[in-house]
Amino acid sequence: MVEMLPTVVALVLAVSVVAKDNTTCDGPCGLRFRQNPQAGIRIVGGQTSSPGAWPWMVSLQIFTSHNSRRYHACGGSLLNSHWVLTAAHCFDNKKKVYDWRLVFGAHEIEYGRNKPVKEPQQERYVQKIVIHEKYNAVTEGNDIALLKVTPPVTCGDFVGPGCLPHFKSGPPRIPHTCYVTGWGYIKDNAPRPSPVLMEARVDLIDLDLCNSTQWYNGRVTSTNVCAGYPEGKIDTCQGDSGGPLMCRDSVDSPFVIVGITSWGVGCARAKRPGVYTATWDYLDWIASKIGPTALHLIQPATPHPPTTQQPVISFHPPSIHPPWYFQHLSPRPPHLRPPRPLLHQPSSVHTSSAPVIPLLSLLTPVQPVSFTLAAYHTRHHTTLSFARRLQHLIEALKMRTYPIKYPSRYSGPVNYQHRFSTFEPLSNKPSEPLLHS
């Protein structure tokens, strides 16, 4: 027993050193410490996550000074011990740092809580709110923000940094199946956000399809990512704003935050998928705020060189996952035609958590933008029949004469539907599980 004592002491010291190093949040990013064993089985339905499954997930909570209560409003992603990534629209109405509290390492949250959090949760103040200089609250352009945290967050078993794309990765590859998480509402007009962190799988959707006339009719820009399902099924919702859209290469690779939950029309409606701010387009901006070294620490290894195989244009996950989730895309071959939009299938499904910051009203129809993934800026031309061109002209005139009006997600004058959740007096209605199909 005495002979084993030096070995035991050495192990204790080693564990102590590892734990100390881990508290700086400079370790590996995008790693799930505790995974739900069913996560690989259920492909379309949302489910409750396991504690510690998404250690970079942050709850942004509005703080009311008169009674010290906190109300979940948005989600965010921990980048390191000092910075959180989120959506700019979360601060349209609450721009002061003292209006906010940040909760890390949470699995369950209490809406309207006025007591200190319990371990392993950590509550922090916001030292600085950095909103993109060109953020447009009307068009939803540049919907990205950073929060400086004080005091620094301590990383551990339930708190860890998320990854951002590598500069050389390029835009997210389509098709690809990814994850969304949040404490958002489980359906439109739900009484309050979900008390438990939920997770769900969603498909990345081609921007041509997402911007077609029966979908978002050109509202989506080149710095957005669409994710969800054509028929609805599952989606983020109020209370999920600012939270991450995450993809990974394989079960052994880290998750990479490819999008920030921004806006959508309703929740889980057919042909109205969630719209996310693409993080890859803002890596330079993020580096200018948190520092290039800090950004490098949360970027995975440089991706493998792309294959010579032509990209597949599809809207359903392939039977075999691609070798990596990012790749440089070659120009679209002229013989490929973009897929036609699917027939309308009304469907109602729940949504994801986050206070409401609606900004999505189509006051004046905009021409659909060209496909926006990196090298896909030039769309090929196809010859249309006279009848087809006439039909397009009639549709365009109808849109100008009768612009589409969508119900707002926010109780203010703006018509866009943010995924931000406004807090209201607590309801006696029991909460329901989030994100089920």
From Swiss-Prot:
EC number(s) stated in the UniProt entry for this protein: 3.4.21.10
Similarity field: Belongs to the peptidase S1 family.
Keyword Thylakoid: no
CDD domains: Tryp_SPc (cd00190)
Protein name, UniProt field: Acrosin
Gene3D superfamilies xrefs: Trypsin-like serine proteases
Peptidase S1 domain mapped to chain residues: 43-291
One GO term of the biological process aspect: single fertilization
Disulphide bridges: 25-155, 29-163, 74-90, 178-247, 210-226, 237-267
GO molecular function terms noted in the UniProt entry: amidase activity; D-mannose binding; fucose binding; peptidase activity; serine-type endopeptidase activity; serine-type peptidase activity
Organism of this sequence: Rattus norvegicus
InterPro entries referenced in this protein's UniProt entry, alphabetically: Pept_S1A_acrosin, Peptidase_S1_PA, Peptidase_S1_PA_chymotrypsin, Peptidase_S1A, Trypsin_dom, TRYPSIN_HIS, TRYPSIN_SER
Protein activity control: Inhibited by SERPINA5.
Catalytic activity, reaction form: Preferential cleavage: Arg-|-Xaa, Lys-|-Xaa
Propeptide: 346-437
Active-site annotation: 89, 143, 241
GO CC term (a single one): protein-containing complex
Signal peptide residues on this chain, from the entry's feature table: 1-19
